Amino acid sequence: MSDKTATPRLSIGLPVYNGQRFIRATLDALLAQTFGDFELIICDNCSTDATEQICREYARRDPRIRYFKNERNLGPAPNYNRCFEHARGELFKWSAADDTIAPAFLAKCVAELDRDPSLSGCYTRTTEIDADGKRLYDHATVLDLDSPSVVARLRSYTFVNHRHHAAPELWAVWRTDVLRRWTPLKGSFPSADRIVILRAGLHGPVKRIEEHLFFNRSHGQRSQTYLDKMKVRPGSRLVKWIGCGPLPSYEWWDASKKGRIVFPEWRWLWEYYKAVHDTPMRFIEKFASFGVLSVLTLKFVPRLGRDLVIASEQLFNRITGFGPKPTAPPASRGGPALRVH
């Protein structure tokens, strides 16, 4: 596609905030794809570095690029959703501003979607790279999301060890009509990208190509490096011993939660139940799916309990003035989604 007025087959959404360090490599990889019938939608979340200049430079050179700069920082998830709102293609893919893909990534994913109309999406195996683009290791954790059974897909996704699962499925090529079946597409809470994958996977199989064509960049500016537990659950001493739950904090995703007592594990479990409830299934599939979630609930008991214990401590400290003073988490970057939650 060479005309911005023409309707592309595929839309790529690239949310970015202060991404000057790696965005050239990301854009070069996207524009070098052997599949060229796409538009590249860049949503800049009020970057203060050279991101805008770089993006406008590329947009002048390639008419497939559509650059939008938000009037204010929307936060991470709304900026991802803003990319999708601008999409015109029948297929959609998100791209982080610091990752890259091999030249054949789009072509191979689109070919699989064309071959099997039942698929919700298609992705490839993942290789971790460093800041210089050098290979670190290949991701080992894979899921059975291409099963024709919705219950099997739910079971596989539900019981994977998410500490070792970097959610590479988020960067798949998706059918746009599948992603339009719920709103908001990506919520403003910890691990919301996993709920996107869950919902899309409930609507149809997600094909994994057994080639390492997606390169996930590890570097010091990624959100996952923010591991200060005292800031994740402000006002709590217990987090030193019992853990803090999903990272980064709820406030990082939703500034309106600043200073409030939150229950991230309860929210995550609720989103699982809501996803199954909202997805059309046969009665027996729905019954079996809720059975899977009942087992998940039992598995979640320690984490749900931790939420309650930390909330009780925070409430007690507020009433009595006892405990550490809350410290604010860093401002939301609104850029690449997390790989560790």
Where are these regions (language model features)?
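N-proximal low-complexity "stem/linker" segments adjacent to membrane-targeting elements
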Residues: M1-A29
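Conserved nucleotide-sugar donor-binding catalytic segment
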Residues: I12, E85, A102, T124, ...
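Acidic helix N-cap motif at the loop->helix transition within catalytic regions
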Residues: R24, D49-E57, A104
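Short aromatic/hydrophobic "clamp" motif used to bind/position activated sugar donors
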Residues: F92
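Conserved donor NDP-sugar-binding/catalytic core segment of glycosyltransferases
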Residues: A104-D138
